[in-house]
Regions:
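Walker A/P-loop-proximal flanking segment of P-loop NTPase domains
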Residues: 1-47, 51-64
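P-loop NTPase nucleotide-binding core
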Residues: 37-38, 44-47, 51-167, 176-182, ...
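Domain-level recognition of nuclease-like catalytic cores that cleave nucleotide substrates
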Residues: 103-128, 530-567
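Sensor-1/coupling segment of RecA-like P-loop NTPase cores
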Residues: 160-162, 166-169, 175-221
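Helix-loop-helix "sensor" segment of P-loop NTPases
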Residues: 216-267
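Winged-helix-like regulatory helical subdomains adjacent to P-loop NTPase cores
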Residues: 271, 275-360
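Short, amphipathic alpha-helical interaction segments positioned at domain boundaries
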Residues: 391-422
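Conserved catalytic cores of phosphodiester-cleaving nucleases, focusing on short active-site segments
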Residues: 445, 471, 480-511, 515-520, ...
């Protein structure tokens, strides 16, 4: 079954995610000690959430298969979304993983005789539990609420009967909300919480692709699951991990892979694993079939063909994301109009600007923007402008609605012109979003190596000795209240140092309020705050920084610093 859900190719190209794997391992180890730590993983589609879950499952089966902790995995979109069908298939997946025979197909556990026969060999109390569920199913009008309650409690009954612990992994967890459409259920999350709270030997690890929806489920105080899960974001790779993945993908072409090729792939993909995969595969095709050189220009051509070509993997993922997202939005005409307008504005637009451009009332446009934010297509930024969450999707939408679609391989002249145009637009989008700078700053932090530099580059008088950071990541607190662009930490236990870094790449001076927010977030992490602003700072902000031991840098400072450390 593992090879069926986690193909050998995916296993071979798995890269890093060691922090997330360690967190999953910690949850498992704590469960063994009777402490339950539920986890929720959020991230864009195809960013790697499912792969890291399967890699955790694979490693567990290899090293702890006979231990006291049993792992189960199910992809909720594959389950029937009627209460009766869901309950039967939910229990079927659990039986498949818990019965210990992974050589059968999971579908063989979906019928009543198989479930009753299998559970009959797993202890009397557990068998009685499964029998009770099927007795309820035999009724003319089954109690749907009871069926789900019995299904959700199945792993706990097994754990109590067998003296085991169970981790239940639920991929694409928000799909469960479809059960709210049944009057007897009404609020499936409340039911799920009630069962979860009564359990003691089961831990849940869930994942979902709609960041906004995942945040509402796990961080909104009105949600039944508020504070029950630690929400972790799975983001794109940093430069080092992106390079490692590219080396694996392109090993058939060159070893080592040229540095300019590594840099070009990171530049166009921003480290998104699926975009890396798609671009690398097109590079292999273009070199193998069209005799292209292994160079940065070939990477840019590959990315352009993948993004604008109707057979491109990135093109089809973007189209899928758009179509799936708009299915959840009432009436597609106005949402599409808003998306088209926003696609042309890398810096984003305010509500008033969008309403004026479309000649519609602000109230109606606000409602559309709320819908689009709910399905993760757009976001409202700190400066109150709206824009796309994903610069690649923004670029694709701009070309898609303009009618440009490549149905074959264009001539070299046409392709070269398209590449130049697309790269210029893409860089403009990424730079306006600050995404390019965020990744560059992380690279910069990783290049710190004890160098001593002029303190004026950080807004202070005395020289600054740059720490040697062991780990550089973005940070989102479990309750969603504290978010920092980058947190960098040293590994020296005696002289441990941690920096909290915020980047604002907008066309205005950064003010005192923005610095106050970073200072508070840095204090919560016991970190030194470093604020980077493209345009610099107001006088009030400079005074605040001086009195609060903050480091400040402008675009010019950052450029000098990058040259000094060699990035």
């Amino acid at each position: 079954m593992l090879d069926y859900i986690y193909p050998e190719e995916e296993q071979r190209f798995f890269t890093n995610r060691e922090y997330t794997l360690a967190l999953l391992g910690l949850s498992r180890d704590l469960l063994g000690q009777g402490v339950r730590k539920h986890l929720a993983l959020s991230g864009f589609r195809r960013v790697g959430k499912t792969v890291v879950l399967k890699e955790f499952l694979r490693r567990h089966l290899e090293t702890n298969r006979g231990g006291d902790c049993r792992l189960t995995y199910m992809d909720l979109p594959r389950l029937a979304l009627t209460p009766e069908g869901f309950a039967v298939q939910y229990v079927g997946y659990l039986l498949y993983w818990l019965a210990g025979d992974l050589h059968q197909r999971v579908e063989s556990f979906f019928d009543a005789p198989a479930q009753l026969a299998t559970s009959g060999q797993m202890g009397a109390a557990f068998s009685e539990h499964v029998v009770r569920l099927h007795q309820e199913l035999q009724k003319e009008k089954p109690d749907q609420h009871l069926l789900l309650e019995l299904a959700f409690n199945t792993p706990e009954v097994y754990a109590q009967t067998a003296g085991k612990r169970v981790i239940v992994i639920l991929d694409e967890f928000p799909e469960i909300l479809a059960l709210d459409n049944y009057p007897q259920i009404h609020d499936v999350l409340a039911l799920f919480r009630a069962v979860l709270q009564a359990q003691s030997r089961v831990v849940y690890v869930v994942a979902g692709s709609m960041n906004g929806l995942m945040e509402r489920i796990f961080l909104d105080a009105a949600s039944p699951l508020f504070v029950h899960f630690q929400l972790e974001t799975i983001g794109p790779f940093g430069r080092e991990d992106c390079d490692a993945l590219v080396r694996k993908r392109l090993s058939m072409l060159a070893d080592p892979v040229p540095g300019d090729v590594l840099a070009a792939i990171y530049q166009v993909t921003r480290g998104h694993p699926f975009y890396v995969y798609a671009t690398a595969m097109r590079v292999i095709e273009n070199i193998s079939l069209l005799n292209k050189p292994l160079a940065s220009a070939t990477v840019q051509e590959a990315f352009t063909l993948e993004t604008l070509g109707s057979t491109g993997r990135i093109y089809n993922l973007c189209r899928y994301v758009l179509e799936q997202s708009l299915q959840g939005v009432r009436g597609e005409t106005m949402p599409q109009a808003v998306l088209q307008v926003l696609a042309q504005q890398p810096a984003g637009m305010t509500l008033t600007e969008i309403a004026a451009r479309l000649k519609r009332p602000s109230g109606a446009i606000r409602q559309v923007l709320t819908w689009l934010a709910d399905v993760d297509l757009v976001e409202q930024r700190e400066d109150k402008t709206y824009g796309y969450r994903d610069p690649v999707l923004q670029l694709w939408v701009a070309y898609y609605y303009s009618g440009l679609q490549l149905t074959g391989i264009p001539s070299q002249k046409v392709l070269s012109n398209l590449v130049a145009e697309l790269m210029e637009k893409y860089e403009r989008v990424a730079n306006e979003l600050g995404l390019a700078k965020e990744s560059q700053v992380r690279e910069l932090l990783e290049a710190f190596n004890g160098q001593e530099v002029d303190g004026r580059l950080f807004g202070v008088d005395s020289p600054v000795k740059l720490p040697v950071f062991e780990r550089v990541t973005s940070y989102l607190s479990p309750d969603g209240q504290v978010q920092v662009d980058s947190v960098a930490e040293t590994s020296d236990a005696e002289n441990h140092e941690r920096w909290a870094v915020e980047i604002k790449w907008r066309g205005r001076l950064s003010g005192k309020k923005e610095l106050e927010k970073l200072a508070a977030n840095a204090r919560s992490r016991s970190a030194k705050p470093w604020f980077i602003s493209k345009m610099g700072f107001t006088q009030e902000a400079l005074e605040f920084a001086r009195h609060n031991d903050m480091l400040l840098s402008s675009q010019a400072d950052l450029e000098v610093l990058a040259k000094l450390v060699g990035t």
